[in-house]
Amino acid sequence: MITDTHTHLYSSQFKEDQPAMMQRAKDAGVTRFFIPAIDSTYTDVMLQLEEDYPKDVFLMMGLHPTSVGENYLEELAHVKEWLDKKKFYAIGEIGMDLYWDKTFLTQQQDAFRTQIQWAKERKLPINIHCRDAFDEVFEVLESEKSDDLRGIFHCFTGTLEQAKQAISYNMKLGIGGVATFKNGKIDKFLNEIDLKHIVLETDAPYLAPTPYRGKRNESAYLTNVVDKLVDIYGLSFDEIAAITTQNSKDVFGI
């Protein structure tokens, strides 16, 4: 059993072949799919996905940092409304993204901190999006750290030191296609990180692993990431799959 801890299965890129794509994933051994939220415009398609695959799909709720704009308080109200009326398995994806634009830096910080507090109140894990913002994300995590806070640093692409810092905040590292890239860098030090801190993800339809880089990603390709971790850790395919799936259960509680 392999767990994809971060996949956008509701993406319009899967519109034409979603059932076939899901079957390919299951044939490859990927049987658990955790679905991050972006903003209110995606809620309906996420709920439909859960209805279509009730035994396979586990939803998160949250406001993505690139969706934080002038109306972010309305978006946060939408997140809270849904958290109050339905079961979700994490709050995410949340965090900070300064790659595209720093206009709403303060608002991103506020949204991140607010959603972390909701997660702690509800004893839910968080799923962190961090792009060009490690210092800013760590600053918020430092101010909010507690025994009740746990989660995943989605699509981790930092340094060894940043990996250790993320782990110190009770975060697992979400490892996906980037680990297979020649210039991905994280594969150079992953063997220094205990496998108990690692979970698997695709971030599909983005960041397809080698040899599919540049193409649409899908959950079936997670086996390529497992193969890479087999090389790095010297364990069997089944051992990597079992350990990382157990790690995901430790985070999500299911």
Model-identified regions with their sequence ranges:
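Mid-domain alpha/beta scaffold segments of enzyme catalytic cores
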Residues: M1-I254
